[in-house]
């Protein structure tokens, strides 16, 4: 699935229309332009530092999880909002841009909502044995 296709799926969960205030240099004329712009306006997606979105590139796990978490307003602010006993993944380190998103999506937890809309984890829930999916 491409970044444009995934952005279109996510944007359809919102009934608003794009006002064109958030655009990218490489989406002019693209079939998903309005969806991409709407998802960006909602803060669900951001492009790359060069001002592009790369709509036809395949979406990565990290990008998809980040979009979903933002769409569901499930976002910890920094690693101190997590719990040390959480599941961790060998391909996801605290310095990675997607670390918080992956941890958020793969650890069932209770949380307290902070005033700035971020969340702080208050406890972990029993998780399935994720390691059975490795290899």
Predicted segments with their positions:
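Feature responds to low-complexity, polar/acidic, surface-exposed segments characteristic
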Residues: 1-7, 11-35, 42-62, 71-135
